[in-house]
Amino acid sequence: MIGRQLIQLLQHRHHELISVRHDKHPGEFKQISNRAGNTVFVRPDLVRGTLEQAYALYESLARGIKRSIFMMFVISEIHPFDDGNGRIARIMMNAELVSAQECRIIIPTVYRDDYLLALRHLSRSRNPDAYIKMLVRAQEFTASIDFSSYEKALQQLRQANAFMQSFEGKLIF
């Protein structure tokens, strides 16, 4: 898929994700710079070009986990929208996995701090090891859950502490 088509798909999925939040401009790239703490994301006027450059690299990667990990980071790092950037990054990541018939990745509540710290570490250090390890562990966790019934999945998620805050417990599986 060429960069332009992938950008259109990203915008379409974002529109679907937050379509009821008109004030957040569903499917439209940001017009005002955004930040999280000390992290300043890509300037609005550079979003499209940065995505196009990133997608050129994306196409060189093998389908599946490699592309999904890259996709997740690119969208998280660019933060192309006013809102919903983390959610759309995870949607795009999982779409890559599904298209390669690989297990999706769920980031349970208890693992959220690990997830954010690994993203921040990669952004600041340019060392992807912790980020890759975190996502592989999350995928292994997701694969360990039996989703054949709601009751089974819910029980396993509770046993794994998935719904706890990180200060209340750790992910167990």
Provide a role label for each language-model segment.
Residues M1-F173:
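FIC/Doc superfamily catalytic core
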